[in-house]
From Swiss-Prot:
It comes from Paracoccidioides lutzii (strain ATCC MYA-826 / Pb01). Its cofactor is Zn(2+). The gene is MDE1. Its EC number is 4.2.1.109. It catalyses: 5-(methylsulfanyl)-D-ribulose 1-phosphate = 5-methylsulfanyl-2,3-dioxopentyl phosphate + H2O. This is Methylthioribulose-1-phosphate dehydratase. Pfam families: Aldolase_II.
Length: 240
């Protein structure tokens, strides 16, 4: 790990540009908090810019995060062990996000931003899928306009109204970092996916850039809420 001294590399998170990752992450977290996605310090966000990874800290109320709370990693960097990760800025008295290796898994696949939320709708659809399809089932929905907000895959354009969206679901673990292997396996099994649900936990969503990751996260949450209501009304998620 890099030798980080007090105050070293603070310039990496100091900018008047609202589009700078150190300013965007607090803004995103405040937005997500207003949706109820990152309550109780849960969830997080990370942005890749050039060879730097900017990551929200662990254990800080997401609506209160400030630029000086942001961690910065050199990229590429090892996912494991944590001691091998190359932090070039590490705020005093704060811990790195437990989501870090999962964010890195998304960046290794070309993402520019990765978001983790504890959305209640995401949690509920994982339970409904488990009850209806068993633990190996994935979330599927079709013939809903908002599906157009989700990419078909890298360089394949956006999904259409008649397409069936599929989001893999992995089982939760006692510790966040232990989800990494299952997340990567889901990415391999569903190479075109931009999201992975975690049963009884939430969702990881990534995109080519911040705007795409944010709008895809919003579109998915809309679809999950709609799916829960459709199920309550006895309506199928996939139109035959």
């Amino acid at each position: 790990m890099s030798d980080i001294k007090d105050g070293n590399n603070d310039h990496l998170v100091q900018s008047d540009d609202p589009e700078h990752p150190a300013n965007l992450i607090p803004a995103l977290c405040r937005n997500f908090y207003s949706h109820g996605w990152v309550t109780g310090t849960g969830g997080g966000a990370s942005i890749k810019r050039d060879n730097h990874i900017f990551i929200a800290p662990s254990g800080v109320q997401k609506e209160l995060i400030q630029p000086h709370n942001i961690f910065v990693l050199s990229f590429p960097t090892p996912k494991y062990p944590p001691s091998a990760r190359q932090y070039i800025r590490k705020p005093l008295k704060l811990n790195p996000s437990a989501c870090t290796p999962l964010f890195l898994a998304a960046f290794e696949r070309g993402a520019g931003c990765c978001i983790h939320t504890h959305s209640q709708w995401a949690v509920l659809v994982t339970l409904l899928v488990e009850r209806e399809k068993g633990p190996e089932g994935c979330f599927e929905i079709s013939n809903i306009e908002q599906i157009k907000g989700i990419p078909r895959g890298k360089g394949k354009g956006m999904m259409g109204f008649f397409d069936t969206l599929k989001i893999p679901i992995i089982e939760n673990t006692a510790f966040e970092e232990d989800l990494t292997q299952s997340l990567e396996e889901a990415m391999e099994m569903y190479p075109d996916t931009y999201a992975v649900l975690v049963r009884r936990h939430g969702i990881y969503v990534w995109g080519d850039d911040v705007a795409k990751a944010k709008t895809q996260c919003e579109s998915l949450d809309y679809l999950f809420q709609l799916a829960v209501e459709m199920h309550r009304l006895g309506l199928p998620w996939v139109k035959s």
